[in-house]
From Swiss-Prot:
The gene is PLSP1. This is Chloroplast processing peptidase. Keywords: Chloroplast, Hydrolase, Membrane, Plastid, Protease, Thylakoid, Transit peptide. It catalyses: Cleavage of hydrophobic, N-terminal signal or leader sequences from secreted and periplasmic proteins. Disruption phenotype: Plants are albino and seedling lethal. It is an enzyme of class 3 (hydrolase).
Length: 291
């Protein structure tokens, strides 16, 4: 937009300024420089003649004004911007704001390769523990001498996807409903040996474990049971479990058969302590059920 302004005045030149209260004219200290104020403060387009009391020469000055967007007010650049520091200029503050607004630390960035690797590893580990195998710690003497306090073992979970538990399997299991009624929870995990399966008739008589009327030959127990137990028929989808330390074990002879759904897995390997590393599966597997 082009604006032509024609001003006629007497030398020495004057700058036209308007104050907030009263209009007044200020003499320009530099006669060779014409000072202009914003359009809103200029007193024009009237012709102005000033009588200074002296004989002054009169001259006419023509001015052209052009609208330049570079003159409009802009935000001040950051003090850290520019080419002096060799940076990209003006983005440092934004980076600080983004850093403060992070929900997770930079190393936990879901888009980074390292974070993805960690999360995949955790997911695989949890899946392995939930579906395949998990480590366990022995806290008591109920399975002594097979397991001592502090022994660590691996319990696998794959076998029971394809078959039902067999006699002599050492299983870890969540507390059954009868124990949860007296304060136990699913977080309470036990380890015992299966001595009878569904449909079997089990009893303890004269220091012998009897299954379907036949005494079991158990070389792995600490000592013969010192109690009597009347015959019990193991219900469907259940097993009967006992500790190898028969006289110091809180097991099925006290609280009854164990539902199969409470079984977590089967002990297959002891990896601690080093001098007792060994497998925990008896030779013959489920052959005892065929005797």
């Amino acid at each position: 937009m082009m604006v032509m302004i024609s001003l006629h005045f007497s030398t020495p030149p004057l700058a036209f300024l308007k104050s907030d209260s009263n209009s007044r004219f200020l003499k320009n200290p530099n006669p060779n420089f014409i000072q202009f104020t914003p359009k809103s403060q200029l007193l024009f387009p009237q012709r102005l003649n000033f009588n200074t009391g002296t004989n002054l020469n009169r001259r006419t000055l023509s001015c052209y004004g052009i609208k330049d967007s570079s003159e409009t007010t802009k935000s001040a650049p950051s003090l850290d911007s520019g080419d002096g520091g060799g940076g990209d200029g003006g983005d440092d503050d934004k980076g600080e704001v983004e850093e403060k607004n992070r929900l997770f630390p930079e190393w936990l960035d879901f888009t980074s390769d390292d974070a993805q690797t960690v999360f995949v590893a955790i997911a695989v580990s949890l899946a392995f523990r939930y579906f395949i195998a998990e480590p366990r710690y022995i806290p008591s003497l109920s399975m002594y001498p097979t397991f001592d306090v502090g022994d660590r073992l691996v319990a696998e979970k794959v076998s029971y996807y394809f078959r039902k538990p067999c006699a002599n399997d050492i299983v870890i299991f969540k507390s059954p409903p009868v124990l949860q009624e007296v304060g136990y929870t699913d977080a309470d995990v036990f380890i015992k040996r299966i001595v009878a399966k569904e449909g079997d008739l089990v009893e303890v008589h004269n220091g012998k474990l009897m299954v379907n009327g036949v005494a079991r030959n158990e070389k792995f127990i600490l000592e013969p049971p010192g109690y009597e137990m009347t015959p019990i028929r193991v219900p469907e989808n259940s097993v009967f479990v006992m500790g190898d330390n028969r006289n110091n074990s809180y097991d099925s002879h006290v609280w009854g058969p164990l539902p199969l759904k409470n079984i977590i897995g089967r002990s297959v390997f002891r990896y601690w302590p080093p001098n007792r590393v060994s497998g925990t599966v008896l030779e013959g597997g489920c052959a005892v059920d065929k005797q």
